[in-house]
Structures are given as structure tokens and as C-alpha cells.
Amino acid sequence: SILLALLCIKGCRVIKLCSQKGSSLLTFNYYRAAAHANLPVSSEITGYTASAFAYLHSRTGEHAYLDAAIRTASFLTDTAWDSASHTFPFEPGSDRAYFFDLGIIARGLMAVYRATGDERYLSRARDAALSLGFDFLGDGCFYPVISVPMKEPLPEEPRWSRKPGCYQLKSALIWRQMGDEHADRMFQVALAMALATHETFLSDEPSMETRMDRLH
């Protein structure tokens, strides 16, 4: 069996990733330790895991990791993607989508594409990159979260994930990986925004450790 335990403790929340032997696909979700309850499948965390399995295969050459990467990427491509709204919702069936999540998912798909050469993953990564550019671009910022299927920006909240900021550059890297002129221009826009705002991002958070945690 394959077991990937990636624990990220944030207050009472723990991310618990695992797969059982013989499962037809790999999906991952948040686990709330205090409540002893799994949340629905997280497309973002599944995207991170696709990248992790592809990396493990590149380092070890073990086919089990490649197989896990393929099954994870196939779930993202075939199930998590919402063809009606042409984007990746926060969770399958969710009524919102996050800029940050889309970039992480697309980069995971690109990692598996590089490992396999399967054009399905490249095509879906491009779809996600297009959604980032068309659905989230605002006036001087990229909206952190939009409604699905209407794709209207949702009001900002006093949480890092509900505000635009330099952390979005991590997801915008997918535009560099696309390798075309238009995508590169979008990355340059995101880079300029990050450079212009990084000094004030989370400026109201007194703990440097907490700031770094939020930037992950």
C-alpha cells in the first residue's frame, strides 16, 4: 500500500493524506482533529499531492509513485473539474473557487504531465490557467475567491485566503510553466502586483512565525 502522511497543524485543523491499497483513485481532504471528522475532498490538497507523487517518482523511480500520481491527476482532470463553469471549485460541487487553489492544481497536473507525457493533464492545466486569467483578474489585483457558477468576486474577509496578496504568486507560476507569450505576460502582471504589495501583506499580524505560516 501507499501511505503519504502530510500533517499540517493549523490550530485544530490537520491535513491528513492517505490512500489504501487497491483504491481506484487517490483523493485527499482536510481532517479536523478536534471534531474527528473528515471534510469533503479538497481539490487543492489533491493538487499538492499530484506534485508530491510525481516528485517522489522522479527521485526514486518507483512505479507505485507514478501510478499514484496518474490516479490523482485523473481525478482532478475527470471529476474535480467543473465543465459547466469551466473551473476547479474549492471542492467538487462547491459554490466557490479560489485563485490560489487553481494554480496549485494546475501545477500538480503539469508535474504529472511532465512525468507521463499524457496530453490530458496538459490540456486541463491550460484550462485552469485560462480560468485564472479570465475569471480572477480585477482592478489592480487578482480576486482571491469567486462564486461558482456566476464567477462574481466574493467580498474580502479578514483572513489571508480571502484577500489578494503576494502569496498568489506561488499559483501564478503556472503561467510561466505554460511557456507561451500571453501566459508569460500574465505572470509578469502577477509579479508586479506582488512586488508592489508584499511589504504590507499581513502587516496587521504581529507574529512573524504566523506570517510565514500564512505565506506557506
Enumerate the predicted regions with their spans:
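Glycan-recognition and catalytic cores of secretory/periplasmic carbohydrate-active enzymes
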Residues: 1-216
